[in-house]
């Protein structure tokens, strides 16, 4: 004799097929899975889901106990991340929501998720890439930096490196991420605290008195890594040795492995002394990018062409 499954049995079967959330945000819109996408000194990034839009997102979680000795820093961190929510640029990871979890003492923020992971791993996976492709990626990073640096107030990333740049490989799109610890500075564009990844840190950053030009230096190191497939200063086996070489003005050995003279000259411009470094806007006009168009450039060109020959009546 055949028995019919109860509705409870059907529901339990459905539950087995669905992936349960580890936690949800206070509004119930975003659910976090247990899958860890990446982690750093103070932050972990998990795969999550936006139930309203039906899209996957990234759930970033900062442990505030890392700043327990400095309550002012905690509040500043929170206010800065909230401000970043207002950034709108195709080469900057979009920030959707920010909140503080008092019970677990964490700062949480939801960002868009990129399909192909970070640029460092993506480049390792695709070792045989044309210089044209590398230039397209580099130009997009620079456009994101230009947006940050010309924002009012100016935003200095301070930790730009290839692991903080993310890729949508299906469309060749590159986005700057990990902006949660960026510095938001006033009219003088001066910042004073030390943050960053040693291999990518400009010399003046160690001196705790710097401007957005530290990002240009880091950007140059990113381009060097993309071209050479080597992390800058990998010849050093300690942070102290990196600092010693950087403070003496010694360039990373990877620079000597760059065979393309145009690429080498471009990188050297980026990692020059602070006053000699071009701005992001100036670098975008560099001959290094001649003939390199990305989607935004092509859209603009198409719009110009579409407007050609039209008569505008006022």
Swiss-Prot record:
Name of the encoding gene: WNK11
Domain of life: Eukaryota
InterPro entries the UniProt entry points to: Kinase-like_dom_sf, Prot_kinase_dom, WNK_Ser-Thr_kinase
Binding positions (ATP): 111-114
EC nos: 2.7.11.1
Domain Protein kinase intervals: 31-289
Family to which this protein belongs: Belongs to the protein kinase superfamily. Ser/Thr protein kinase family. WNK subfamily.
Keyword Thylakoid among record annotations: no
PROSITE patterns linked to this entry: PROTEIN_KINASE_DOM (PS50011)
Pfam families, sorted: Pkinase
Start and end residues of each stretch annotated as Disordered: 1-22, 295-314
The keyword Nucleotide-binding is assigned to this record: yes
Keywords: ATP-binding, Kinase, Nucleotide-binding, Serine/threonine-protein kinase, Transferase
Active site: 178
Single GO MF annotation: protein serine/threonine kinase activity
Name used for this protein in its record: Probable serine/threonine-protein kinase WNK11
Catalytic activity: L-seryl-[protein] + ATP = O-phospho-L-seryl-[protein] + ADP + H(+); L-threonyl-[protein] + ATP = O-phospho-L-threonyl-[protein] + ADP + H(+)
């Amino acid at each position: 004799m055949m028995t019919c499954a109860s509705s409870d049995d059907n529901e339990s079967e459905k539950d087995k097929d669905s992936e349960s959330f580890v936690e949800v945000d206070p509004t119930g819109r975003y659910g976090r899975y247990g899958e860890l996408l990446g982690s750093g000194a103070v932050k972990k990034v998990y795969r999550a889901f936006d139930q309203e839009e039906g899209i996957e997102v990234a759930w970033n979680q900062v442990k505030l106990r890392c700043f327990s000795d400095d309550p002012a820093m905690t509040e500043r961190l929170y206010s800065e991340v909230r401000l970043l929510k207002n950034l709108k640029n195709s080469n900057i990871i979009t920030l959707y929501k920010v909140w503080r979890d008092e019970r677990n003492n964490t700062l949480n923020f939801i960002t868009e998720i990129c399909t192909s992971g970070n640029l460092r791993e993506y480049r390792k996976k695709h070792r045989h890439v044309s210089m044209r492709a590398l230039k397209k990626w580099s130009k997009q990073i620079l456009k994101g930096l230009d947006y940050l640096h010309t924002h009012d107030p100016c935003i200095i990333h301070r930790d730009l490196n290839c692991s903080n740049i993310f890729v949508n490989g299906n469309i060749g799109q590159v986005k700057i991420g990990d902006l949660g610890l960026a510095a938001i500075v006033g009219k003088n564009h001066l910042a004073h605290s030390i943050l960053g990844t040693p291999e990518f840190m400009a010399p003046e950053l160690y001196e705790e008195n710097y401007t957005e030009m530290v990002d240009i230096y880091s950007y140059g190191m990113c381009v060097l890594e993309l071209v050479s497939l080597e992390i800058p200063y990998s010849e050093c086996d300690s942070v102290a040795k990196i600092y010693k070489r950087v403070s003496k003005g010694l360039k990373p050995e990877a620079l000597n492995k760059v065979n393309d003279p145009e690429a080498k000259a471009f990188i050297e411009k980026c990692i020059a002394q602070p006053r000699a470094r071009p701005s992001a806007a100036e670098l975008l006009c560099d001959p290094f990018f001649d003939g390199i168009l990305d989607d935004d450039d092509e859209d603009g060109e198409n719009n110009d062409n579409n407007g050609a020959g039209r008569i505008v009546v006022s």
